[in-house]
Amino acid sequence: MKIIMLGAPGAGKGTQAKKIAAKYAIPHISTGDIFRANIKNGTELGAKAKEYMDKGLLVPDELVVDLIMDRFKADDCKNGYILDGFPRTTAQAAALDTILHELGIRLTAVIGIKADSKGLVKRIGGRLVCKKCGASFHKEF
């Protein structure tokens, strides 16, 4: 099962992706988690991403795609995965399409989550960040 979960920041992608991942025993892959893991493990891609992040800049699409592609090669992705919040740009979508084609991967589903702007503001405004791992969470959602 190979799923992509799309939606605005705060729409609940991560929350729903975690539930689906647990139910089907597949990894939940988010770009934030990939960045944190690669930085923590001192990988070359992680070091490159950290340079941009430390400057408050967005990590370039090409580097994000490289990190995603590297993650797809992990053993735990052999039976599927749920990709949370990627692609975010047209360029990322085109690159992902190329990667999936090259790797012979067919998606099972693409799920879009919609939320009204008031709900998004409430979710984003109440986000907290774990001091130990850097993951964001919300006490209510």
Predicted regions and their residues:
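Glycine-rich phosphate-binding loop of ATP-dependent small-molecule kinases
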Residues: 1-141
